[in-house]
Amino acid sequence: MSIKIRLQRKGRKKKAFYTIVVSNSRSPRNGKFLEKIGFYNPNTNPYTISINVDKAVNWLIKGAQPTCTVKSFFLKEGIYYKKYLLSGVKISKSEIEQKLKAWKEKKIILHK
């Protein structure tokens, strides 16, 4: 059973928003899912992304494969960086949070 992290379409015609879900790769796009880990709303300006980082990292460590769109969200939010810090050398959770916060601040400065 292959597990995917993907978008599930919600909303009405031309006003779609998406929930980020973990599901079996064989289930339909809007069908049964294992867990909801966030949402994406492209209708707001700027768009809104909310992801439960701990759940996302947990599923990535278990081997779930994100789709291309979800992977780009994870890269923007620093989820892959947190997974890298957790799987590497043993460091405390406070140090992980400090490094993640510094990474996000550096990213904000670069994009201004």
Curated annotation (Swiss-Prot):
<dbReference type="InterPro" id="IPR023803">
    <property type="entry name" value="Ribosomal_bS16_dom_sf"/>
</dbReference>
<protein>
    <recommendedName>
        <fullName>Small ribosomal subunit protein bS16</fullName>
    </recommendedName>
</protein>
<dbReference type="GO" id="GO:0006412">
    <property type="term" value="P:translation"/>
</dbReference>
<dbReference type="Pfam" id="PF00886">
    <property type="entry name" value="Ribosomal_S16"/>
</dbReference>
<dbReference type="GO" id="GO:0003735">
    <property type="term" value="F:structural constituent of ribosome"/>
</dbReference>
<dbReference type="InterPro" id="IPR000307">
    <property type="entry name" value="Ribosomal_bS16"/>
</dbReference>
<comment type="similarity">
    <text>Belongs to the bacterial ribosomal protein bS16 family.</text>
</comment>
<dbReference type="GO" id="GO:0005737">
    <property type="term" value="C:cytoplasm"/>
</dbReference>
<keyword id="KW-0687">Ribonucleoprotein</keyword>
<dbReference type="GO" id="GO:0015935">
    <property type="term" value="C:small ribosomal subunit"/>
</dbReference>
<keyword id="KW-0689">Ribosomal protein</keyword>
